[in-house]
Amino acid sequence: MNYAQDALWWRLTHPTIRDLASLLTAPPLWHTGCELPVRELLGEHGFRLLLAWDEQWQSDPQRQPENLTRNRYALGKYAEDLLAYWFTHAPHAKLLAANLPVYGNEAGGNSTLGEMDYIAELNGTLYHIELACKYHGSATGEHMAGLNPRDTLARKQRKLQRQLALLATPEAQAALRQHGIAPDNIRSASIVRGIGFTAAGTLPPAFPPQAWSG
């Protein structure tokens, strides 16, 4: 479904709310095999909740949380802040942990195996959610990278798969228990967003057909 065709989308005028709506509903730039469904992410209230916030923030700018604008020009951090806000305030969601570190047993247990981006409850189901939000490009769509040439799409894809697999490790389950979260019945899911840029403005067939391009 193309959520941008929803008539309510075009009633959203506040820049931050439109950014949040894009983060919630955009198609994935690549598939991980465990995408979080947009309907699950939006919940029952969906765009109507966004519309209510839009009207409130337009009429009273002081109601917009300051932390949602401080990282606007750092794409990854901005996306993290927006999603954390949604998990904290949407009525169908509950944020249990964010950026939860997972430590290994080497060097006295101080080595970091990774972080779990979010542990959140959505519609009564517990999720370990990993977020990736990237702008990548190349002339042909092959070997895509960000502004830093070492920040390749392939590298990010591999890292994301490792992060999604963290939940199954004993170390991650111990970290969850230490945080007061029972690791049973938690599902790993991804939210992948972004744009792929090529000289032709289109993406190769290996990308999802609805992925955003430019």
Language-model features: locations:
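Intrinsically disordered, low-complexity Ser/Thr/Pro/Gly-rich regulatory segments
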Residues: M1-G214
